[in-house]
Design a protein with these regions (language model features):
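Acidic/polar surface patches and capping/hinge elements
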Residues: 1-235
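Glycine- and aromatic-enriched low-complexity segments, predominantly in secreted/extracellular proteins
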Residues: 234-246
Length: 246
């Protein structure tokens, strides 16, 4: 698939996931095995809630956040349209980029890794054939890099570029837990929690999330450079006229 802004799908493809016999893999394996299992005794109540809260279509959360920011900053209709377009164009290219990486590396999900750990050649990882992720069903695509992390890093990068980094109270509503709202003071705080949620949900290794965050930021940075904004100075004369005339 041809990207919208990127020159090619693998432009920012991350390095391969950690080797199965590495110390890094051992650490991330044991982390998700402990924190991400259904009915975990190691995860806190808040970590379990976070894992469930974000277990929906991550782009939808970030569009809600953008709506809050647009209203708080009193953008004109034209400026608001540009903000949403920039955000979702970034998401579109990030989806292309992370699927390119996922199907290049075809790295296993925690549920498969943990159940069949006896085959990984690492004597520091113990198999649990009955292990289930906290969030229930595992996504059908490969694990590395993490989609939530990629999208959230891109969303935070774009919105920080558009609105700046000043504190902004953000209420985010769960896509999957009706009526449950969590509050944040910055785009970066949202990004961090959304990324960590996939570990608590038992869906991803931390290495997936780290790679996703780097990929998402790189794609967003490229998009911003290609389609710069002028929102801070409110000097979009056409947008200001459009807002006043209507």
């Amino acid at each position: 698939m041809t990207p919208f802004a990127l020159e090619y799908a693998n432009q920012f493809r991350p390095e391969p996931a950690p080797a199965l016999t590495s110390a890094e893999y051992t650490a991330v394996f044991n982390e998700v095995k402990s924190l991400g299992i259904a009915n975990s005794t190691a995860a806190t109540a808040d970590q379990k809630l976070i894992g469930r809260f974000w277990n929906g279509a991550i782009q939808n959360y970030w569009n809600e956040i953008t709506q809050t920011a647009v209203q708080a900053h009193h953008l004109t209709t034209a400026q608001s349209a540009r903000a949403f377009a920039l955000l979702n164009l970034t998401f579109a290219d990030e989806v292309i980029a992370f699927y390119d990486a996922k199907y290049t590396y075809k790295f296993w999900r925690p549920v498969t890794a943990i159940r069949t750990a006896a085959t990984d050649g690492n004597d520091q990882t113990a198999a649990d054939p009955n292990w289930l992720p906290q969030s229930g069903n595992t996504a059908a695509d490969p694990s590395y890099p993490g989609a939530h992390a990629t999208i959230s890093a891109g969303g935070a990068f774009v919105l920080s570029s558009v609105f700046g980094d000043k504190p902004l109270h953000l209420n985010v509503t769960s896509e999957v837990l009706p009526g449950v709202v969590r509050s944040f003071d910055s785009f970066a705080d949202v990004e961090k929690e959304a990324s960590l949620s996939r570990i608590y949900a038992g869906q991803h290794f931390r290495s997936d999330e780290n790679a996703g965050e780097s990929l998402g930021s790189a794609v967003a940075d490229f998009v911003i450079d290609k389609f710069p904004t002028r929102f801070h100075g409110r000097d979009d004369d056409e947008g200001d006229r459009e807002g006043r005339d209507h």
